């Protein structure tokens, strides 16, 4: 069945619900005391996992649209990417405010030096910031071919973010490994999609 614009509208509504309902759950859990004895860590991990899930969902759109021959699915990619950035920002704020404290926000630079996994996290966030700021059609027209080159940096985030998660956890948990494996599979799938273009590009110089 070929998807219509109406289907895409419903998909976007579903994305909004999937991205906002967890935030509502988190707020309720905080107010009702549903978190553990270390709520700051719970909030940091929850927001980080949500950002990572949305990143993986964003990366899944292109291969899914290609293999299912549903090009309209690509219209959902920007919304997923923006929600990924939003949750990534919440993750950064939760660390800066709950872990360091507003009065010690100046220590963030020191923390980045002494904790390399934080450096990977902030690099990932900065890339997502650049992608969010240039996600409009106006930016795409203005930047031309440079727009696609910039937005290919999302694959750098797909490498750094799972490493950041794996490196940051202090207890052995399967979830960081699962997310890393999923990111690796999506990157491999993307590589297969790009390989024919790469081979064609090489032939031009023979």
UniProtKB/Swiss-Prot annotation:
Task: Tell me what topology the record assigns in the membrane.
Answer: Multi-pass membrane protein
GO terms assigned for molecular function: electron transfer activity; FMN binding; heme binding; metal ion binding; oxidoreductase activity, acting on diphenols and related substances as donors
Cite a single GO BP annotation. protein repair
Cellular component aspect of the GO annotation:
plasma membrane
Q: How is the cofactor bound?
A: Binds 1 FMN per subunit.
Q: Which InterPro entries match?
A: Fe3_Rdtase_TM_dom, MsrQ-like
Q: Which cofactor does it need?
A: FMN; heme b
The transmembrane segments are: 13-33, 79-99, 116-136, 147-167, 169-189
Keywords linked to the UniProt accession? Cell inner membrane, Cell membrane, Electron transport, Flavoprotein, FMN, Heme, Iron, Membrane, Metal-binding, Transmembrane, Transmembrane helix, Transport
Main subcellular location: membrane
One Pfam family from the UniProt entry? Ferric_reduct
Keyword Cell inner membrane listed:
yes
This chain's function reads: Part of the MsrPQ system that repairs oxidized periplasmic proteins containing methionine sulfoxide residues (Met-O), using respiratory chain electrons. Thus protects these proteins from oxidative-stress damage caused by reactive species of oxygen and chlorine generated by the host defense mechanisms. MsrPQ is essential for the maintenance of envelope integrity under bleach stress, rescuing a wide series of structurally unrelated periplasmic proteins from methionine oxidation.
Hey, which family's this protein in?
Answer: Belongs to the MsrQ family.
What is its quaternary makeup? Answer: Heterodimer of a catalytic subunit (MsrP) and a heme-binding subunit (MsrQ).
- Listed name of the protein: Protein-methionine-sulfoxide reductase heme-binding subunit MsrQ
Origin organism of this chain?
Yersinia pestis
| Gene (UniProt) | msrQ
């Amino acid at each position: 069945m070929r998807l219509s614009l109406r289907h895409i509208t419903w998909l976007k509504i579903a994305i909004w619900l999937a991205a906002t309902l967890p935030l509502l759950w988190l707020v309720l859990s905080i107010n009702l005391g549903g978190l553990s004895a270390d709520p700051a860590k719970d909030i940091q991990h929850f927001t980080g996992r949500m950002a990572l899930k949305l990143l993986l969902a964003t990366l899944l759109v292109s291969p899914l649209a290609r293999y299912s021959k549903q090009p309209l699915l690509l219209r959902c990619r920007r919304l997923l990417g923006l929600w990924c950035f939003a949750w990534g920002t919440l993750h950064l704020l939760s660390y800066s405010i709950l872990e360091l404290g507003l009065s010690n926000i100046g220590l963030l630079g020191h923390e980045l030096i002494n904790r390399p996994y934080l450096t990977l996290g902030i690099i990932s966030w900065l890339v997502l910031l650049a992608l969010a700021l240039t996600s409009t059609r106006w930016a795409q027209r203005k930047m031309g071919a440079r727009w696609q080159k910039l937005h290919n940096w999302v694959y750098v985030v797909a490498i750094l973010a799972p490493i950041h998660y794996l490196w940051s956890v202090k207890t052995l948990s399967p979830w960081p490994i699962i997310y890393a494996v999923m990111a690796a599979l999506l990157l491999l799938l993307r590589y297969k999609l790009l390989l024919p273009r790469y081979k064609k590009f090489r032939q031009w110089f023979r």
